[in-house]
């Protein structure tokens, strides 16, 4: 099954509230909810989380889940401490799943930037 995460940058609270209310109504009606949205207040906030290295980690994990941070660091040839920081940041916004080791559950990340 194809899974998509949606990143939103610069949306006002009203947009976030409308999206949450619509999801609440659908869930209350019994519809299964499989959406993942992350909202950033600014481009700078997004850029602070989604770096080039973290994007590379997501791509790697999408195709090669890892049993641990140490195993991931070895697989990509990077320092454990830096990989740990990257995994923490990406897991915090739900782009890395830690349920059974480390994996990237989404095959697509879509971004909407408000100007």
Predicted regions and their residues:
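General nucleic-acid-binding
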Residues: 1-28
């Amino acid at each position: 099954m194809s899974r998509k995460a949606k990143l939103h940058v610069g949306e006002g609270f009203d947009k976030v509230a409308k999206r949450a209310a619509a999801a609440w109504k659908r869930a209350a009606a019994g519809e299964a909810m499989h959406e993942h949205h992350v909202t950033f207040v600014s481009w700078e906030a997004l850029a602070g989380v989604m770096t080039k290295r973290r994007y590379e980690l997501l791509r790697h994990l999408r195709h090669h889940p890892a049993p641990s941070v140490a195993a991931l660091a070895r697989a990509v040839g990077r320092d454990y401490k830096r990989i740990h920081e990257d995994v923490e940041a990406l897991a915090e916004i739900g782009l890395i799943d830690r349920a059974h080791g480390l994996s990237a559950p989404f095959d697509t990340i879509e971004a909407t930037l408000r100007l």
